[in-house]
Amino acid sequence: DLTGEFLRHMGTRFSAAYSGDLSRQRETGQRVLDQLEDAPDLVIDPRFNEVQTDEQIDVMMPILIGRDPRFADLVAAMNTDTKSFQKIIETVFNYWVSHECDIGGIQSWADYSGGVVSAFEGAMASAKSGTDTAIFTSGGTIATMVGHVLRLTSDRVYEFYEPVFNCSITRIIFNSRK
């Protein structure tokens, strides 16, 4: 509610609003929009969903333990050391986005990032000049969009994933030529 109040106080008006289909994304988006005058309807697009970190950890942890004894040490400490858990997420994410990762049964980086970029470019293409569009999503999706805008290679995306906080605001300004 505070984010919506802040945006209302700032005079923000959105011409369009999107979110993934995760309940936290939909609920955040709707609660913000409920605080604004003349808010658009929230468009739900699952391509804005978060990275499936839990699934990746479950599938990739045994593979990474077998490849690197230091990773096994992180896993042993993850329930008592939050830094170890963050390093596990980082290692898993960076393996997932690498060209080495060819694991069936989970969403590939190419499929995930392709969906995010497609949804993001669709939102940009629909935006009219001088308007603001809201996308209520999660850290991995924001990092993927920022990586796309900055034309980063996939191994650089995690640098923008970890520092994103829940309910943070990332503003991307663009025009039709850039």
Regions found by a protein language model. Give the residues of each.
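Beta-strand elements within well-structured catalytic alpha/beta cores of enzymes
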Residues: 1, 18, 131-137
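Active-site-proximal alpha-helix that buttresses catalytic centers in soluble enzyme cores
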Residues: 1-45, 109-110
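Active-site catalytic microenvironments for nucleophilic, acid-base chemistry
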Residues: 6-9, 31, 35, 122, ...
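Short, active-site-adjacent cap segments at secondary-structure transitions
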Residues: 24-26, 50-51, 141-143
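Short aromatic-enriched loop/helix-cap "lid" or pocket-rim segments at secondary-structure transitions
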Residues: 29-30, 53-59, 147-148
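Phosphate-handling substructures
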Residues: 36-115
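A mid-sequence, solvent-exposed acidic-amphipathic segment
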Residues: 103-133
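Domain-level recognition of soluble alpha/beta enzyme cores
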Residues: 153-177
